[in-house]
């Protein structure tokens, strides 16, 4: 990353309170692959006014190919030689140039709003704030018209052109348990669809973003490499992943020999390509032989369905709810109190089913809101008895990890994991290191929910959505690392949150105009329709198809994929004031 731009980015982060952008240990220009420039990029013309030329230059920086060759056409040779375009870029909008003009030379300063950043790996993160003065930009008149003769190091991307040039794709890496794959969204500028598969597999081999380096496994890590570009399954170079053409991936230097690891190699490749609309069959070879002889003619997504990142946890368990402080299930349009401890206990204020839907973790709160308020965490099989596993003045709504361990926040600041000791069967409370979160975002954690793959934790702190990585240390302990804020547009209005997918979070808010919103891993937020929602809304739970929220009239549901559904509808049987929805997670 250029020193000037790094300094500007750090200053902007301090001013705006936005999250820093991770940079790789060996920065490189964004997208150094040599390929044709997109046809919609501007070029300098002899009659172009200096102000127009500067704006067109910012648009041209959206193409990273060949070390920003498209943008370098706007520079004099000396400026091009001096310009350091390595590292991350700032995405800017509402640009104003303040110019001082002479006959043969123009000096300009740039003012703009910062909307985000794009790392050298293609990681985009939203931000907010005003661009600190990057330094003067100077233009000179040449025989071919005005050209930029001096400019700050680093890359400034025009927001509109960025949206037109880059496309969001998702890489997938294996979770530590090998049960599923974890999303790592990237933005790539590849105008030729036939080059996209090669670009994505190359990025897989290069590895995950820095904040994921200790939370996922990359079965495609070096020395493994591509033997050549990805082709059609029959070796053709056009129509890759289109129709029935499929894709052929030839790898070499694969050290993995056990079948499960090879299955994960395939899963990483297949889900990455399939989610980019590069269709199979996927012929995957390693060192001149099929990755797995069973699939020498090609893999499909069905062959790696066990790791499907889009599968809903415990789908067969169905929707449950807390009604009058007890756990109920739905039988058609009627509720049934569940047997066992969770149906008998009253005063339950937050609950979650385990990922497989067979266990329950629930918080019982006595004297809620009073000085002597007391909360306790209970864990047990659904329909059976429960064991008290933690207590405190207050406890957050529990959340389950992929390995069936319950996480909860005690008294707003102490994150712990509640487990059963293997030898004694007794409950044990293991602290989670959350110093990085508390240092950067001080204040009580009012909600904490683990992602389906359990490599990320989303939290509500001071009405803001804070995302952190879940790292397991060499000693076997856990820590929340790389905390950053998501959804600047949500302000401080967030009440509760839930993971809809591994990349998308649903939140309830105190904003009556937008009571329910979504925010993704990039930090981009959008709003669900407000129709049918009464304020206030509190608990939210979600799966890939449906979001459920607790409101004054009971539990409401919304399915974005449902044809013609423009608002929220009541859940039959749960139109009870104070009812709170419960799902696996």
Curated annotation (Swiss-Prot):
It is found in: Cell membrane. It comes from the Bacteria. Keywords: Cell membrane, Lipoprotein, Membrane, Palmitate, Signal. Belongs to the LpqB lipoprotein family. A lipid is attached at residue 18 (S-diacylglycerol cysteine). Pfam families: Germane, Gmad1. Residues 1-17 form the signal peptide. This is Lipoprotein LpqB. The keyword Lipoprotein applies. A lipid is attached at residue 18 (N-palmitoyl cysteine). It comes from Mycolicibacterium paratuberculosis (strain ATCC BAA-968 / K-10). GO terms for cellular component: plasma membrane. Transmembrane segments: none annotated. HAMAP family: LpqB_lipoprot (MF_01373). It is a lipid-anchor. Residues 24-48, 560-585 are annotated as: Disordered.
């Amino acid at each position: 990353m250029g020193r000037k731009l790094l300094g500007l980015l750090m200053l902007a982060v301090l001013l705006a309170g936005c999250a820093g952008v991770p940079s790789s240990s060996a920065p490189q220009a964004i997208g150094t692959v040599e390929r044709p420039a997109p046809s919609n990029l501007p070029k300098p013309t002899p009659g172009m006014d200096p102000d127009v030329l500067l704006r067109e230059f910012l648009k041209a920086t959206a193409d990273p190919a060949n070390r920003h060759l498209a943008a370098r056409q706007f520079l004099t040779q000396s400026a091009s030689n001096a310009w350091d375009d390595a590292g991350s870029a700032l995405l800017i909008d509402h640009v104003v140039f303040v110019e001082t003009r002479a006959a043969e030379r123009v000096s300009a300063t740039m003012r703009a709003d910062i909307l985000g950043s794009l790392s050298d790996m293609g990681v985009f993160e939203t931000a907010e704030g005003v661009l600190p003065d990057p330094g003067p930009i100077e233009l000179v008149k040449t025989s071919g018209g005005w050209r930029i003769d001096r400019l700050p190091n680093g890359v400034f991307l025009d927001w509109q052109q960025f949206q037109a040039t880059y496309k969001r794709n998702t890489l997938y890496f294996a979770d530590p348990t090998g049960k599923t794959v974890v999303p790592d969204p990237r933005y790539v500028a590849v105008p030729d669809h036939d080059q996209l598969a090669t670009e994505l597999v190359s990025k897989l081999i290069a590895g995950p973003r820095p904040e994921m380096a200790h939370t996922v496994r990359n079965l495609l890590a070096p020395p493994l490499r591509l033997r050549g570009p990805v082709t059609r399954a029959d070796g053709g170079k056009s129509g890759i992943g289109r129709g029935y053409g499929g894709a052929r991936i030839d790898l070499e230097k694969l050290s993995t020999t056990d079948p499960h690891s090879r299955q994960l190699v395939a899963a990483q490749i297949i889900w990455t390509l399939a989610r980019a609309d590069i269709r199979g069959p996927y012929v995957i070879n390693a060192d001149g032989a099929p990755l797995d002889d069973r699939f020498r003619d090609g893999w499909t997504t069905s062959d790696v369905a066990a790791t499907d990142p889009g599968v809903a946890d415990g789908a067969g368990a169905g929707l449950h709810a807390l009604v009058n402080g007890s756990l109920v299930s739905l039988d058609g349009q009627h509720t049934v109190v569940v047997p066992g401890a969770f149906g008998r206990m009253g005063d339950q204020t937050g609950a979650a089913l385990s990922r497989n839907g067979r266990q329950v973790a629930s918080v019982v709160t006595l004297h809620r809101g009073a000085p002597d308020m007391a909360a306790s965490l209970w864990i047990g099989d659904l329909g059976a008895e429960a064991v008290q596993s933690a207590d405190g003045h207050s406890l957050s709504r529990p959340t389950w990890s992929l390995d069936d361990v319950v996480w909860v926040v005690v008294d707003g600041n102490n994150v712990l994991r509640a487990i059963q000791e293997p030898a004694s069967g007794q409950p044990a409370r293991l602290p989670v290191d959350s110093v990085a979160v508390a240092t950067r975002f001080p204040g009580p954690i009012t909600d904490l929910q683990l992602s389906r793959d359990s490599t990320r934790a989303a939290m509500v702190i001071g009405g803001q959505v804070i995302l952190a990585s879940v790292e397991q240390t060499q000693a076997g302990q856990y820590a929340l690392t790389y905390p950053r804020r998501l959804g600047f547009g949500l302000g401080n209005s967030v009440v509760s949150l839930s993971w809809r997918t591994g990349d998308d979070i649903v939140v309830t808010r105190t904003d009556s105009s937008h009571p329910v919103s979504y925010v993704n891993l990039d930090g981009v937020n959008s709003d669900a329709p407000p129709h049918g929602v009464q304020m206030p809304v509190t608990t939210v739970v979600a799966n890939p198809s449906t979001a459920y929220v607790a409101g004054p009239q009971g539990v409401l549901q919304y399915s974005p994929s449902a044809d013609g559904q423009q608002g929220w509808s009541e859940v039959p049987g749960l139109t009870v004031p104070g009812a709170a929805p419960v799902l696996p997670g």
